[in-house]
Curated annotation (Swiss-Prot):
Species per Swiss-Prot/TrEMBL record: Clostridium botulinum (strain Hall / ATCC 3502 / NCTC 13319 / Type A)
Topology versus the membrane: Single-pass membrane protein
Source organism, top-level taxon: Bacteria
Protein name as annotated: Ribonuclease Y
EC number: 3.1.-.-
Keywords: Cell membrane, Endonuclease, Hydrolase, Membrane, Nuclease, RNA-binding, Transmembrane, Transmembrane helix
InterPro entries: HD/PDEase_dom, HD_domain, HDIG_dom, KH_dom, KH_dom_type_1, KH_dom_type_1_sf, Ribonuclease_Y, RNase_Y_N
UniProt KW Cell membrane keyword: yes
Secretion signal, residue range per the UniProt entry: none
CDD domains, per the entry: HDc, KH-I_RNaseY
Family from the record: Belongs to the RNase Y family.
KH domain ranges (all copies): 203-288
Length: 513
């Protein structure tokens, strides 16, 4: 056999093998397809079974849920029915209670109507009895109804008037005791903490001379030296028999101080003639001006007051040379400032404002001889001019009652001013003014009806009035004292305060036989 034959056999074998392989593959594929079909049918059957089971389960759950909902609805319906029944029972009970109350009210109304009728019957009977009694009383007393009313009203009026006077006296006494106690405490604390050291001053200065020959040199040839000094200073020089002394007299204390300084310098210098006098007077004026400024600054330093206008400080310094009833006005102002500040502290009020007003309250006295009007009003205008606050301006103007006080500080300064002025030894007045004041006091008292005698005692600080007991009763004495106080306050000027003491004495005398 040749190679071609082998090749053909090989090809045939290969073809046969391929055909067998294809057959085997096809067979296996058909087997797999059959198995897959079976598996698909199986899975489909299982899925159908599962779906049927779930459907049945869902239907069962839905039935159970419906059953639960039905049970819940039935329960709620039962509860609502029970609540409605309960409310119906309550309404029925309330209706029954209202019926009972209505019945009770009807019974009460009926009883009240009966009582009202009885009351009307009693009132009618009482009116009849009252009319009978009134007629009988008129017949017995001989007075008409109107006359009896007037008599009773007069009796009641007298009783009420007496009781009112007694009540007023008790209230006034109690209020005065309380007010006096508190005022004494405040004033005592203030006075204890304020120690003022100054004395009353006069309207004259005495200049000591080294010898009596100096008097002639002061007078000068034909009196030219003394005339020059008096003309330049406006002060009277009194040269009399008083050994080694010359008296300077004048009501302007600043001029008097200028004259004193100038005269003392002339005496020390020894050269006394008109030209030298004029030179010394000019020097003295400058010294006094410097002294005025220093005194004003010292006053503000002592009281702790700052921020004053320079002109107010100068006016304060001028007060050193001003007196009131012999009391130095600058020292008085400083004392009032301290007292007002201390009392303000005790009362819980701003002490700085009270001290400021106290220091400036008499500032008007520095120019009152140059400007017309009360010094309080002048002072308030000066304070306003130099831009002090409205409270300070008002307090200065109100410290003597010329203006209505608008602050507690104004009242405190009034009190401090009175305390400083009334302090024993602080002030004095001329004999003539003193006598006139005593006479006027007794005259005011004697003008009142029912006064038997009156005496001004305690240097005019008390008026003692003896009244006729048959003319005035105790109530009348109280009223008289109050009226006399008002009249004294309106008609008299006086330092401090005046006590009005009305005395009513009744004596009963019998003799045993």
């Amino acid at each position: 056999m040749g190679p071609t034959k082998y090749i053909i056999i090989a090809v045939v074998i290969i073809i046969i093998c391929v055909i067998l392989g294809l057959y085997i593959v096809d067979k296996k594929a058909k087997e797999k397809l059959s198995e897959a079909s079976k598996e698909a049918r199986r899975l489909k059957e299982e899925a159908e079974r599962d779906a049927e089971a779930k459907k049945k389960e869902a239907i069962l759950e839905a039935k159970e849920e419906a059953h639960k909902l039905r049970a819940e609805v039935e329960r709620e319906n039962r509860e609502r029915r029970n609540e409605v029944q309960r409310l119906e029972r309550r309404i029925i009970q309330k209706e029954e209670a209202l019926d009972k109350k209505s019945e009770a009210l009807e019974n009460k109304e009926e009883a009240l109507n009966k009582k009202q009728q009885k009351i009307e019957d009693v009132e009618t009977h009482m009116e009849e009895l009252h009319e009978k009694q009134r007629t009988e009383l008129e017949r017995i007393s001989g007075l008409t109804t109107e006359q009896a009313k007037e008599f009773l009203l007069e009796q009641v009026r007298k009783e009420v008037k007496h009781e009112t006077a007694v009540m007023i006296k008790e209230i006034e006494t109690k209020a005065k005791e309380e007010a006096d106690k508190r005022a004494r405490e405040v004033i005592t604390y203030a006075i204890q903490r304020c120690a003022a050291d100054h004395v009353a001053e006069t309207t004259v200065h005495v200049v000591n001379l080294p010898n009596d020959e100096m008097k002639g040199r002061i007078i000068g040839r034909e009196g030219r030296n003394i005339r020059t000094l008096e003309t330049l200073t406006g002060v009277d020089l009194i040269i009399d028999d008083t050994p080694e002394a010359v008296i300077l007299s004048g009501f302007d204390p600043i001029r008097r101080e200028v004259a004193r300084i100038a005269l003392e310098k002339l005496i020390v210098d020894g050269r006394i003639h008109p030209a030298r006098i004029e030179e010394m007077v000019e020097k003295a004026k400058k010294e006094v001006e410097i002294s005025i400024k220093e005194e004003g600054e010292q006053a503000t330093f002592e009281t702790g007051i700052h921020g004053l206008h320079i002109e107010l400080i100068r006016l304060l310094g001028r007060l050193k040379y001003r007196t009131s009833y012999g009391q130095n006005v600058l020292k008085h102002s400083i004392e009032v400032s301290h007292l007002a500040g201390l009392m303000a502290s005790e009362l819980g009020i701003d002490p700085t404002l009270a001290k400021r007003v106290g220091l400036l309250h008499d500032i008007g006295k520095a120019v009152d001889h140059e400007v017309e009007g009360p010094h309080a009003i002048i002072g308030s205008e000066i304070a306003k001019k130099y831009r002090e606050s409205a409270l300070v301006v008002n307090a200065i103007g109100a410290h003597h009652g010329d203006m209505e006080p608008q602050s507690l500080e104004a009242i405190l300064v009034q009190a401090a001013d009175a305390i400083s002025a009334a302090r024993p030894g602080a002030r004095r007045e001329t004999l003539e003014a003193y006598i006139k004041r005593l006479e006027k006091l007794e005259e005011i008292a004697n003008e009142c009806e029912g006064v038997e005698k009156s005496y001004a005692i305690q240097a005019g600080r008390e008026i003692r009035i003896m009244v006729k007991p048959e003319v005035l009763d105790d109530t009348g004495c109280i009223e008289m004292a109050r009226n006399i106080v008002k009249q004294i306050e309106s008609e008299l000027e006086y330092p401090g305060q005046i006590k009005v003491n009305v005395i009513r004495e009744t004596r009963a005398i019998e003799y045993a036989k």
